[in-house]
Amino acid sequence: MTIASVDRTIQLISTGAIAGSTCSPDLAKAPWEFDSGTPGYGPGSSMGDVIPAGSPRQGQLPESYRSAGTEELRERIRAAKETLGDRVVILGHFYQRDEVLQHADFVGDSFQLAQAARSRPAAEAIIFCGVHFMAETADLLSGPEQAVILPNLAAGCSMADMADIDSVTECWEQLEELYGTEPDADGRVPVIPVTYMNSSAALKGFCGEHGGIVCTSSNAETVLEWAFERGQRVLFFPDQHLGRNTAKAMGVPLEQMPMWNPRKPLGGSTAEELDAARVILWHGFCSVHKRFTVDQITTARAEHPGVRVIVHPECPMPVVDAADEYGSTDYIRKAIAAAPAGSTFAIGTEINMVQRLAAQHPEHTIFCLDPVVCPCSTMYRIHSGYLAWVLEALIAGDDKPAEVLNRITVSEDVAGYARIALERMLAAKPPAGAAAAVVEPVEASTTDTGDAAAPPVETSTTHAGA
């Protein structure tokens, strides 16, 4: 794997060795310094978001890992992987730092990695280098005897936290009081809940229990079509931008997409506005993708004539409208790989992925739309020190038994309904011929399953360590 270290970039900026800026000087520090302090998402894009009370916290990492250098940690991880062999599989999300991702057996987006977890039924432990909701989904789709491990329990997701089960349940009760529960003449119920993959297992379970479904950024249009066949309206959470951008591309007028603010009666809308709604959007967003602006696109076009601007659908609608294309992380990766040499790309997604793509494709000019280095706060909480810690704990020694640290489990009362919502998503297929119509369905199958599904990128041990 090509190393394109954002960590190194941050260190060089912090010492003045190179020009540039970061969104927080604390990014130059190790994540365990935040684990012992005031609860929060950490430095980076979510540093201004308020973390819910009771969010998981990570205990102190042992000193031998905190004081180890990059090369020592790399060798310890390599040795532990060699000892454990097929008993363990490491999954790494596109947004992870390269110092972690170089050790991954599979690299992909959240759902591709959940599929990868299911593809290794013989592995005793699945180490998920991502964030909490991703590890939960891996636990839902893996075997009951497999342990899913999150190296740092503080690696949550501010967007996923913006919709909690109590607030969604209260919203649902208000909507049922307004709409009733009886289907119309076509058999469609008043409202169908749809949750983005970037949500807690509890919300996936809520959708499964109430006739709803899960979506990814690559199959959101297919899922909304599924929901509209069964419901008069959709309640979409937690990301307003993915819901709005997808519904708009399907022809839903903006005036039929009211926002639901859980702190206000009827979400801040009138009964008449909700009655006319097609898609009710939860008041949530991704702090990484919220940073991208139309002004950044304007600057990119002025400084790089002919630039191809691709952004993630979690970006605000004006940014998506101003871009040339939008698509999931896997769509962005494939679009760059398929482009003729000499292409120039301005990318609106997380900096670790953008910088890695630039290193992997020297034949192109690739840069992040946001000139400020500001990684995902919670992805950044995963560090090779934590990875080495949970790996080495799985190895029994002369004076210690093997130990599973930071295991993520979903309770069975939630898991049953959550799996139903996921299976509904797996069964939803895009209509024949739809993939050529607009950008998003082109790669709708990349995180879906079935005959056309694209697997995550599988790496080899020797290649990963390069």
Predicted regions and their residues:
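Intrinsic-disorder-associated, low-complexity terminal segments enriched in Asp/Asn/His/Tyr and depleted
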Residues: D448-D451
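Active-site loop-to-helix "anion-binding N-cap" substructures in soluble metabolic enzymes
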Residues: T2-I347, M353-A435, H463-A466
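Hydrophobic-composition signal
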Residues: V439-V442, A454-V457
